[in-house]
Amino acid sequence: MKIALGIEYNGQNYYGWQRQEKVRSVQEELEKALSHIANEKIEIFCAGRTDSGVSGTGQVVHFETNAVRPEKAWAFGTNAHLPDDIAVAWAKQVDDEFHARFSATARRYRYILYCNKLRSAILAGGITHCHLDLDAEKMHQAGQCLLGEQDFSSFRAAQCQSHTPWRNVHHLNVSRIGKYIIVDIQANAFVHHMVRNIVGSLIEVGAGNQPIEWMQWLLEQKNRQLAAPTAKPDGLYLVDVIYPQKFDIPKRPIGPLFLEDGLLNRTLK
C-alpha cells in the first residue's frame, strides 16, 4: 500500500531534507522512525527538498509498504520515534498513482523577517533578523514583475541542477504584521535558492537601496551576479504543497505559528 504523510520540521539542526552521509538530515530521521513502525526498510519521497536550515510546516511525503497499520499508527507511532523537531501532522492511505513530488501542481513558501534594531533571543533561528525598518509596500510592488512564467536565471544558484531556469510564479505577496514582514510566494516549482535570492533582492528595495523597478531589470538581465546576496535560510518555511482534488490530500492552516492567513493583509488561498 501507499501512504502519504504531512510533515512539520525545524530545519535548524539539519543539513537539509535529503539523506546524506555523516550529517543529519530530515529524510534519514523520518525513514528510521517509519522503518521501526513498519518493521521493514522504508524509503520516502518528498514534495520538495529543502536546504540546510530551512524549515517546513507543509511538507508532504509518500512511501510504499507491505505493513498494514491504521493511519493513527503511522502518525502517532512514528512521532514517538522522531526527535522533537520533526513531527507527522497527518497520515493517509493514497492511490497508487499518487506521488508526493510529481503529482504536485505547486509549492508555497513563506519567508519571515523580523525588523528591529536589536535581535531576538527567543525567535533566533526561526526568523531572519533585519535591523532596518523595511518598506513592505515597496517590496510587494517590486515583486509583482515576477508573476507568471519567466526565466529566473538572475535568482538561480550557480549549483542548480535543473535543466531549465523557467518557472511559473502564481503569487508573490509581501505583508507586515507589526515588526514582522512576511514574503509569501507560490509557484509550480522553484530553482535552487530561488526564494532566498528573491527575498535578498527585495530587502534591497525595502531598505531604499534600490528602486522598485530594479527587480524587473534584474529579471531581464538573467545574471545572478547582479542581484543581491542570498537571504539566510533561518526565516524560510515550506508551508504548503498543492495537489489535484482527486487525491484528497489533507489541508492544514497556512502558518507557520501565528501567521495564519486571516492575520495577513494580503493572502491568496
UniProtKB/Swiss-Prot annotation:
Its EC number is 5.4.99.12. One of its GO terms (biological process) is tRNA pseudouridine synthesis. Keywords: Isomerase, tRNA processing. It comes from the Bacteria. GO terms for molecular function: RNA binding; tRNA pseudouridine(38-40) synthase activity. Pfam families: PseudoU_synth_1. Gene3D superfamilies: Pseudouridine synthase I, catalytic domain, C-terminal subdomain, Pseudouridine synthase I, catalytic domain, N-terminal subdomain. Transmembrane segments: none annotated. CDD domains: PseudoU_synth_EcTruA. It catalyses: uridine(38/39/40) in tRNA = pseudouridine(38/39/40) in tRNA. The keyword Phosphoprotein does not apply. It is an enzyme of class 5 (isomerase). Substrate binds at Y109. The keyword tRNA processing applies. Signal peptide: none annotated. The active site is at D51. Belongs to the tRNA pseudouridine synthase TruA family. Formation of pseudouridine at positions 38, 39 and 40 in the anticodon stem and loop of transfer RNAs. Homodimer. NCBIfam families: hisT_truA. This is tRNA pseudouridine synthase A. It comes from Haemophilus influenzae (strain 86-028NP). The gene is truA.
